[in-house]
Regions:
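Sec/Tat signal peptide C-region and signal peptidase I cleavage site
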Residues: 31-35
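Small-residue-enriched, tightly packed secondary-structure blocks
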Residues: 36-199
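N-terminal secretory signal peptides
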Residues: 1-14, 18-30
Length: 199
C-alpha cells in the first residue's frame, strides 16, 4: 500500500512573501557591508576619462590638474559628478547635488552647500566634478570641509580647489567661468539629504 505525500499549495501572498524574503537575504547584508568598506582607488586615466565625458570636452588642463592633485594626495578613492544651480543661489550660498561613485562600495546621492560671491548668481546649472581622497567609507563624505592653503589653481581653463577635513580631501573641479569663481570657495558641507541649512 503506497502512501501519498501531502501536497503543499502556496497562496499568491505566500509566494510573494517567500520571494521577498529570499531577495532580502541576498541583497540587504551585502548593501550594509558595503557601507563601511574602504573604497578602492581610481587611476588618473579613469578620472580624466570620466571628466571628459562629464564636461563634454577634452581639455589638457583636466589631465594636468588631476596629475598635480594625485602627486600631493595620492589616488582618489571616490569622485562626485553633480550640478549646482536651478535656483540654487540663496543668501550668498551655493547649493548642489550629485552622485558619488566608488569602485567597490557602490554609489550614493550627495548634497552640498557652500559660499559664493555676487557675480556667481547668474551661473545656473554649473556642472561640477569632485575628486575625493582618503575616504574611509562611503558615509565618511558627510562632513564640513575647509579650504587648504595654497591648493587652488587654474590650469588650461579648469579650476581646482582643495578642501579638507582631517585626512579626507575633496577637490571640486570646474570649467569656464565656474572655474575662476570656484577659486573663492571657502568651505563645503556634504549632507545625505537636501537641506537649506549651510551650517
Amino acid at each position: 500500500m503506497s502512501v501519498s505525500k501531502p501536497s503543499v499549495i502556496l497562496s499568491r501572498r505566500d509566494m510573494l512573501s517567500l520571494a521577498a524574503g529570499v531577495a532580502c537575504a541576498g541583497v540587504l547584508p551585502a548593501s550594509f557591508a558595503r557601507a563601511d568598506v574602504r573604497p578602492e582607488t581610481f587611476s588618473s586615466s579613469e578620472i580624466v576619462d570620466n571628466g571628459h565625458r562629464f564636461f563634454g570636452s577634452v581639455t589638457r588642463g583636466l589631465a594636468e590638474g588631476v596629475e598635480s592633485a594625485n602627486k600631493r594626495w595620492g589616488k582618489p578613492n571616490a569622485y562626485i559628478l553633480g550640478q549646482e544651480g536651478s535656483g540654487a543661489f540663496v543668501g550668498g550660498l551655493r547649493y548642489g547635488e550629485g552622485t558619488m561613485y566608488t569602485r567597490n562600495a557602490g554609489k550614493r546621492p550627495v548634497y552640498w552647500q557652500g559660499p559664493t560671491i555676487g557675480i556667481d548668481a547668474g551661473l545656473d546649472g554649473d556642472r561640477t566634478m569632485m575628486l575625493v581622497y582618503n575616504l574611509p567609507e562611503v558615509e565618511g563624505i558627510f562632513r564640513r570641509y575647509s579650504g587648504v592653503d595654497g591648493a587652488a589653481y587654474l590650469i588650461g581653463g579648469v579650476g581646482f580647489t582643495a578642501l579638507n577635513n582631517n585626512e579626507v580631501v575633496v577637490i571640486p573641479v570646474r570649467t569656464g567661468v565656474g572655474a575662476r569663481l570656484g577659486m573663492n570657495l571657502g568651505y563645503l558641507k556634504f549632507t545625505p539629504e537636501k537641506t537649506w541649512n549651510p551650517f
